[in-house]
Amino acid sequence: KCAIHSQAGSILHIPREGGYLCRVYVDLGVVPEDDNHKVRNTPIEKIIEKANEIYAPYFVDVKMVAWHSVYEVGHRLVDAFDDNDDDPRVFLTGDACHTHSAKAGQGMNVSMQDGFNIGWKLGHVLDGRAPKELLSTYHGERQPAAQNLINFDREWSTLMATPTEELDDPEAVEKYYVAAEEFAAGMMTQYEDNLIVGTTQHQDLATGFPVGKRFKSFEVLRRCDAYPQHLGHQHTADGRYRIYAFADAPKAGETSKLSEWAEKVGPILAKFTPEGADENTYFDVKAIYQQTDHHEYEILDAPLLFRPRNGKFNIPNWENVFNALPGDKDIFHTRGISRDGAVVIVRPDQYVGAVLPLDDPAAVEDYFSSALIKLT
Protein backbone atom coordinates (compact mmCIF):
# COMPACT_ATOMS: atom_id res chain seq x y z
CA LYS A 1 0.00 0.00 0.00
CA CYS A 2 1.03 3.63 -0.40
CA ALA A 3 0.06 6.47 1.95
CA ILE A 4 0.27 10.07 0.70
CA HIS A 5 0.05 12.91 3.18
CA SER A 6 -0.06 16.57 2.16
CA GLN A 7 -1.40 19.88 3.44
CA ALA A 8 -4.68 19.20 1.61
CA GLY A 9 -5.29 15.85 3.31
CA SER A 10 -4.35 12.21 2.94
CA ILE A 11 -4.81 9.37 0.46
CA LEU A 12 -4.24 5.64 0.79
CA HIS A 13 -3.50 3.55 -2.33
CA ILE A 14 -3.91 -0.22 -2.51
CA PRO A 15 -3.02 -1.81 -5.89
CA ARG A 16 -5.60 -4.27 -7.19
CA GLU A 17 -5.50 -7.24 -9.53
CA GLY A 18 -5.08 -6.96 -13.29
CA GLY A 19 -2.28 -4.41 -13.28
CA TYR A 20 -4.45 -1.34 -13.81
CA LEU A 21 -7.00 -1.20 -10.98
CA CYS A 22 -6.23 0.68 -7.78
CA ARG A 23 -8.28 1.18 -4.65
CA VAL A 24 -8.01 4.76 -3.42
CA TYR A 25 -9.15 6.07 -0.05
CA VAL A 26 -9.58 9.85 -0.17
CA ASP A 27 -9.88 11.84 3.04
CA LEU A 28 -12.73 14.31 2.47
CA GLY A 29 -11.86 16.31 5.57
CA VAL A 30 -13.72 17.11 8.77
CA VAL A 31 -17.49 16.61 8.56
CA PRO A 32 -19.54 19.38 10.27
CA GLU A 33 -21.68 18.23 13.19
CA ASP A 34 -24.85 19.49 11.47
CA ASP A 35 -24.04 17.68 8.21
CA ASN A 36 -26.75 15.05 8.83
CA HIS A 37 -24.86 12.52 6.70
CA LYS A 38 -25.04 14.71 3.58
CA VAL A 39 -21.36 13.96 2.98
CA ARG A 40 -22.41 10.44 1.98
CA ASN A 41 -23.95 11.92 -1.18
CA THR A 42 -20.66 13.44 -2.35
CA PRO A 43 -20.44 12.81 -6.13
CA ILE A 44 -17.47 10.99 -7.60
CA GLU A 45 -16.40 14.16 -9.44
CA LYS A 46 -15.94 15.95 -6.11
CA ILE A 47 -13.98 13.02 -4.72
CA ILE A 48 -11.60 13.08 -7.71
CA GLU A 49 -11.25 16.84 -7.35
CA LYS A 50 -10.34 16.45 -3.68
CA ALA A 51 -7.86 13.70 -4.56
CA ASN A 52 -6.04 15.97 -7.01
CA GLU A 53 -5.88 18.71 -4.38
CA ILE A 54 -4.00 16.26 -2.20
CA TYR A 55 -1.78 15.13 -5.10
CA ALA A 56 -0.85 18.72 -6.07
CA PRO A 57 1.37 19.70 -7.81
CA TYR A 58 0.78 16.27 -9.41
CA PHE A 59 -2.60 15.04 -10.62
CA VAL A 60 -4.34 11.87 -11.72
CA ASP A 61 -6.47 11.65 -14.86
CA VAL A 62 -9.08 9.09 -13.82
CA LYS A 63 -10.22 7.04 -16.82
CA MET A 64 -12.82 4.88 -15.12
CA VAL A 65 -14.37 4.34 -11.71
CA ALA A 66 -15.52 0.76 -11.23
CA TRP A 67 -17.19 1.47 -7.88
CA HIS A 68 -17.17 4.08 -5.17
CA SER A 69 -18.80 4.89 -1.87
CA VAL A 70 -18.55 7.47 0.91
CA TYR A 71 -18.52 6.48 4.55
CA GLU A 72 -18.01 8.19 7.89
CA VAL A 73 -15.52 6.60 10.26
CA GLY A 74 -17.17 5.10 13.33
CA HIS A 75 -15.30 3.18 16.01
CA ARG A 76 -17.69 0.70 17.60
CA LEU A 77 -17.30 -2.56 19.50
CA VAL A 78 -19.94 -4.96 20.82
CA ASP A 79 -19.95 -5.88 24.49
CA ALA A 80 -19.91 -9.61 23.75
CA PHE A 81 -19.08 -11.82 20.78
CA ASP A 82 -21.52 -14.47 22.01
CA ASP A 83 -24.82 -14.60 23.91
CA ASN A 84 -23.78 -16.54 27.02
CA ASP A 85 -20.58 -17.11 28.93
CA ASP A 86 -21.49 -20.62 30.08
CA ASP A 87 -23.31 -22.15 27.11
CA PRO A 88 -23.12 -19.81 24.09
CA ARG A 89 -25.44 -20.48 21.14
CA VAL A 90 -25.14 -17.28 19.09
CA PHE A 91 -21.81 -15.94 17.84
CA LEU A 92 -20.98 -12.66 16.13
CA THR A 93 -18.00 -12.15 13.83
CA GLY A 94 -16.44 -9.44 11.70
CA ASP A 95 -18.30 -6.19 11.07
CA ALA A 96 -21.13 -7.34 13.33
CA CYS A 97 -18.63 -6.97 16.19
CA HIS A 98 -16.29 -4.13 15.31
CA THR A 99 -16.27 -1.14 12.95
CA HIS A 100 -13.44 1.24 12.17
CA SER A 101 -11.79 3.04 9.27
CA ALA A 102 -10.36 1.20 6.28
CA LYS A 103 -7.08 3.08 6.43
CA ALA A 104 -5.18 0.33 8.22
CA GLY A 105 -6.39 -2.33 5.79
CA GLN A 106 -7.32 -4.57 8.72
CA GLY A 107 -11.10 -5.00 8.48
CA MET A 108 -11.23 -8.16 6.39
CA ASN A 109 -8.08 -9.59 7.99
CA VAL A 110 -9.39 -9.35 11.54
CA SER A 111 -12.88 -10.47 10.51
CA MET A 112 -11.47 -13.60 8.88
CA GLN A 113 -9.50 -14.31 12.04
CA ASP A 114 -12.76 -14.03 14.01
CA GLY A 115 -14.37 -16.56 11.68
CA PHE A 116 -11.43 -18.96 11.76
CA ASN A 117 -11.29 -18.76 15.54
CA ILE A 118 -14.92 -19.73 16.11
CA GLY A 119 -14.97 -22.04 13.08
CA TRP A 120 -12.40 -24.57 14.23
CA LYS A 121 -13.73 -24.49 17.78
CA LEU A 122 -17.27 -25.23 16.60
CA GLY A 123 -15.89 -28.03 14.46
CA HIS A 124 -14.09 -29.60 17.41
CA VAL A 125 -17.14 -29.41 19.68
CA LEU A 126 -19.63 -30.64 17.09
CA ASP A 127 -17.58 -33.68 16.11
CA GLY A 128 -17.11 -34.62 19.74
CA ARG A 129 -13.38 -34.11 20.12
CA ALA A 130 -13.55 -31.06 22.43
CA PRO A 131 -15.74 -30.04 25.40
CA LYS A 132 -18.37 -27.35 24.84
CA GLU A 133 -16.45 -25.08 27.25
CA LEU A 134 -14.05 -24.48 24.37
CA LEU A 135 -16.65 -22.19 22.76
CA SER A 136 -16.43 -19.78 25.68
CA THR A 137 -12.84 -18.94 24.71
CA TYR A 138 -14.05 -17.23 21.51
CA HIS A 139 -15.22 -14.00 23.14
CA GLY A 140 -12.29 -13.95 25.55
CA GLU A 141 -9.80 -14.11 22.69
CA ARG A 142 -11.40 -12.06 19.93
CA GLN A 143 -13.01 -9.19 21.86
CA PRO A 144 -9.66 -7.88 23.19
CA ALA A 145 -8.15 -8.35 19.72
CA ALA A 146 -10.91 -6.18 18.25
CA GLN A 147 -10.39 -3.55 20.96
CA ASN A 148 -6.68 -3.43 20.13
CA LEU A 149 -7.55 -2.99 16.46
CA ILE A 150 -9.86 -0.08 17.20
CA ASN A 151 -7.24 1.56 19.42
CA PHE A 152 -4.66 1.16 16.65
CA ASP A 153 -7.03 2.40 13.96
CA ARG A 154 -8.12 5.42 15.98
CA GLU A 155 -4.51 6.51 16.39
CA TRP A 156 -3.61 5.71 12.77
CA SER A 157 -6.66 7.40 11.20
CA THR A 158 -6.19 10.47 13.40
CA LEU A 159 -2.56 10.70 12.36
CA MET A 160 -3.50 10.34 8.68
CA ALA A 161 -6.09 13.11 9.00
CA THR A 162 -3.75 15.56 10.76
CA PRO A 163 -2.48 18.32 8.42
CA THR A 164 1.24 18.06 7.81
CA GLU A 165 1.92 21.49 9.28
CA GLU A 166 0.41 20.36 12.60
CA LEU A 167 2.65 17.30 12.92
CA ASP A 168 5.60 17.55 15.31
CA ASP A 169 7.62 15.39 12.92
CA PRO A 170 7.05 15.52 9.13
CA GLU A 171 7.95 11.81 8.98
CA ALA A 172 5.55 10.86 11.78
CA VAL A 173 3.17 8.94 9.49
CA GLU A 174 5.96 6.86 7.97
CA LYS A 175 7.58 6.16 11.34
CA TYR A 176 4.30 5.08 12.92
CA TYR A 177 3.46 2.78 10.03
CA VAL A 178 6.88 1.09 10.16
CA ALA A 179 6.66 0.72 13.94
CA ALA A 180 3.20 -0.87 13.63
CA GLU A 181 4.14 -3.17 10.75
CA GLU A 182 3.93 -6.35 12.83
CA PHE A 183 0.48 -5.36 14.08
CA ALA A 184 -0.71 -4.69 10.54
CA ALA A 185 0.65 -8.10 9.50
CA GLY A 186 -1.58 -9.77 12.10
CA MET A 187 1.32 -11.04 14.23
CA MET A 188 0.83 -8.90 17.37
CA THR A 189 -2.36 -10.46 18.74
CA GLN A 190 -1.60 -12.38 21.92
CA TYR A 191 -4.25 -14.41 23.73
CA GLU A 192 -4.32 -14.67 27.52
CA ASP A 193 -4.30 -17.94 29.49
CA ASN A 194 -7.38 -20.09 28.94
CA LEU A 195 -8.34 -23.69 28.16
CA ILE A 196 -6.10 -23.77 25.09
CA VAL A 197 -3.44 -21.19 25.96
CA GLY A 198 -0.94 -22.27 28.58
CA THR A 199 1.17 -20.19 30.91
CA THR A 200 4.51 -18.63 30.05
CA GLN A 201 6.29 -20.67 32.74
CA HIS A 202 8.59 -22.31 30.18
CA GLN A 203 8.71 -19.50 27.63
CA ASP A 204 12.49 -19.27 28.03
CA LEU A 205 12.78 -22.63 26.23
CA ALA A 206 11.53 -21.09 22.97
CA THR A 207 11.55 -17.31 23.19
CA GLY A 208 10.82 -16.90 19.48
CA PHE A 209 7.46 -18.65 19.82
CA PRO A 210 5.55 -16.53 22.38
CA VAL A 211 2.66 -18.41 23.98
CA GLY A 212 -0.65 -17.00 22.77
CA LYS A 213 0.77 -15.45 19.58
CA ARG A 214 0.87 -16.65 15.99
CA PHE A 215 3.48 -19.30 15.25
CA LYS A 216 6.29 -17.41 13.53
CA SER A 217 7.62 -19.79 10.91
CA PHE A 218 11.23 -20.39 9.91
CA GLU A 219 13.04 -22.58 7.42
CA VAL A 220 14.22 -26.10 8.22
CA LEU A 221 15.47 -29.04 6.14
CA ARG A 222 13.11 -31.95 5.55
CA ARG A 223 15.11 -35.11 6.23
CA CYS A 224 13.40 -37.48 3.77
CA ASP A 225 14.43 -35.50 0.68
CA ALA A 226 16.83 -32.82 2.00
CA TYR A 227 14.40 -30.15 0.82
CA PRO A 228 14.30 -26.77 2.63
CA GLN A 229 10.81 -26.05 3.93
CA HIS A 230 9.17 -23.39 6.05
CA LEU A 231 8.06 -25.23 9.14
CA GLY A 232 4.87 -23.22 9.44
CA HIS A 233 3.93 -23.96 5.84
CA GLN A 234 3.40 -27.60 6.81
CA HIS A 235 0.46 -26.48 8.92
CA THR A 236 -2.62 -26.88 6.73
CA ALA A 237 -6.11 -25.88 7.86
CA ASP A 238 -7.26 -29.39 8.72
CA GLY A 239 -8.33 -28.94 12.35
CA ARG A 240 -5.34 -30.77 13.80
CA TYR A 241 -3.02 -29.61 16.54
CA ARG A 242 0.66 -29.39 15.63
CA ILE A 243 3.26 -30.55 18.11
CA TYR A 244 6.80 -29.45 17.24
CA ALA A 245 9.38 -31.39 19.25
CA PHE A 246 12.74 -29.59 19.10
CA ALA A 247 15.40 -32.18 19.92
CA ASP A 248 18.20 -32.00 22.44
CA ALA A 249 21.78 -32.47 21.20
CA PRO A 250 21.92 -36.24 20.44
CA LYS A 251 21.06 -37.28 16.91
CA ALA A 252 18.32 -39.70 15.94
CA GLY A 253 19.11 -43.25 17.00
CA GLU A 254 20.92 -42.17 20.16
CA THR A 255 19.38 -42.15 23.62
CA SER A 256 18.03 -38.67 24.21
CA LYS A 257 15.32 -36.64 25.90
CA LEU A 258 13.50 -36.59 22.57
CA SER A 259 13.45 -40.37 22.17
CA GLU A 260 12.20 -40.83 25.73
CA TRP A 261 9.60 -38.09 25.23
CA ALA A 262 8.33 -39.68 22.02
CA GLU A 263 8.00 -43.09 23.66
CA LYS A 264 5.77 -41.68 26.39
CA VAL A 265 3.80 -39.12 24.35
CA GLY A 266 2.61 -41.64 21.76
CA PRO A 267 0.32 -43.45 24.25
CA ILE A 268 -0.82 -40.08 25.65
CA LEU A 269 -2.05 -38.88 22.26
CA ALA A 270 -3.75 -42.23 21.69
CA LYS A 271 -6.06 -41.42 24.63
CA PHE A 272 -7.60 -38.59 22.59
CA THR A 273 -7.70 -40.41 19.23
CA PRO A 274 -10.78 -42.39 18.08
CA GLU A 275 -10.34 -46.14 18.07
CA GLY A 276 -9.42 -47.43 14.62
CA ALA A 277 -8.48 -43.95 13.31
CA ASP A 278 -5.08 -43.07 11.91
CA GLU A 279 -2.71 -42.23 14.75
CA ASN A 280 -2.24 -38.70 13.40
CA THR A 281 -5.97 -37.98 12.95
CA TYR A 282 -6.01 -35.25 15.60
CA PHE A 283 -2.29 -34.51 15.96
CA ASP A 284 0.53 -33.76 13.55
CA VAL A 285 3.76 -34.37 15.47
CA LYS A 286 7.07 -33.23 13.98
CA ALA A 287 10.68 -33.56 15.14
CA ILE A 288 13.36 -30.95 14.47
CA TYR A 289 16.92 -32.11 15.11
CA GLN A 290 19.85 -29.80 15.81
CA GLN A 291 22.15 -31.58 13.34
CA THR A 292 22.63 -29.46 10.21
CA ASP A 293 23.99 -32.33 8.11
CA HIS A 294 21.14 -34.68 7.23
CA HIS A 295 23.65 -37.46 6.48
CA GLU A 296 24.46 -37.78 10.19
CA TYR A 297 21.52 -40.11 10.77
CA GLU A 298 18.96 -42.22 8.93
CA ILE A 299 15.32 -41.26 9.00
CA LEU A 300 14.51 -44.78 10.20
CA ASP A 301 16.41 -43.90 13.38
CA ALA A 302 13.76 -41.32 14.29
CA PRO A 303 11.12 -42.52 16.79
CA LEU A 304 7.97 -44.09 15.36
CA LEU A 305 5.89 -41.20 16.68
CA PHE A 306 7.37 -39.06 13.89
CA ARG A 307 6.69 -41.73 11.25
CA PRO A 308 2.95 -42.38 11.63
CA ARG A 309 1.19 -44.84 9.36
CA ASN A 310 -1.80 -43.51 7.44
CA GLY A 311 -4.73 -44.59 5.36
CA LYS A 312 -6.10 -47.83 4.01
CA PHE A 313 -2.67 -49.24 3.18
CA ASN A 314 -1.00 -48.21 6.45
CA ILE A 315 1.72 -46.27 4.65
CA PRO A 316 4.30 -44.41 6.79
CA ASN A 317 4.52 -40.65 6.57
CA TRP A 318 8.17 -39.68 6.05
CA GLU A 319 7.61 -35.91 6.07
CA ASN A 320 7.60 -35.20 9.80
CA VAL A 321 11.35 -35.27 10.50
CA PHE A 322 13.45 -32.13 9.97
CA ASN A 323 16.95 -30.77 10.55
CA ALA A 324 18.10 -27.28 11.40
CA LEU A 325 19.83 -25.40 8.59
CA PRO A 326 23.43 -24.23 9.08
CA GLY A 327 24.72 -20.82 10.10
CA ASP A 328 22.33 -17.91 10.52
CA LYS A 329 19.47 -20.08 9.25
CA ASP A 330 19.56 -22.32 12.32
CA ILE A 331 16.02 -22.30 13.73
CA PHE A 332 17.33 -23.06 17.22
CA HIS A 333 19.36 -19.85 17.14
CA THR A 334 16.92 -17.57 15.33
CA ARG A 335 13.88 -18.59 17.40
CA GLY A 336 15.69 -18.79 20.72
CA ILE A 337 15.11 -22.51 21.26
CA SER A 338 16.95 -24.18 24.11
CA ARG A 339 19.70 -26.61 23.11
CA ASP A 340 18.24 -28.90 25.78
CA GLY A 341 15.14 -29.16 23.61
CA ALA A 342 11.58 -27.86 23.80
CA VAL A 343 8.03 -28.75 22.82
CA VAL A 344 5.84 -26.19 21.06
CA ILE A 345 2.13 -26.98 20.75
CA VAL A 346 0.36 -25.02 18.01
CA ARG A 347 -3.41 -24.79 17.80
CA PRO A 348 -5.38 -25.44 14.59
CA ASP A 349 -5.49 -21.66 13.96
CA GLN A 350 -1.67 -21.43 14.13
CA TYR A 351 -1.54 -19.76 17.54
CA VAL A 352 0.99 -21.13 20.02
CA GLY A 353 -0.91 -22.97 22.74
CA ALA A 354 2.01 -23.98 24.94
CA VAL A 355 5.78 -24.18 25.27
CA LEU A 356 6.80 -27.18 27.36
CA PRO A 357 10.03 -28.87 28.49
CA LEU A 358 11.17 -31.94 26.61
CA ASP A 359 11.71 -33.87 29.83
CA ASP A 360 8.08 -33.55 30.99
CA PRO A 361 5.83 -35.57 28.66
CA ALA A 362 3.03 -35.48 31.25
CA ALA A 363 2.69 -31.75 30.52
CA VAL A 364 1.43 -32.66 27.04
CA GLU A 365 -1.40 -34.69 28.58
CA ASP A 366 -2.20 -31.85 30.98
CA TYR A 367 -2.57 -29.41 28.08
CA PHE A 368 -4.80 -31.62 25.95
CA SER A 369 -6.93 -32.70 28.91
CA SER A 370 -8.39 -29.18 28.80
CA ALA A 371 -8.50 -28.80 25.03
CA LEU A 372 -9.88 -32.22 24.06
CA ILE A 373 -12.02 -35.07 25.39
CA LYS A 374 -10.28 -38.27 26.39
CA LEU A 375 -11.73 -41.22 24.50
CA THR A 376 -9.89 -44.04 26.28
Residue ranges and their predicted role:
Residues 25-27, 68, 93, 246, ...:
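Generic beta-strand/beta-sheet core signal
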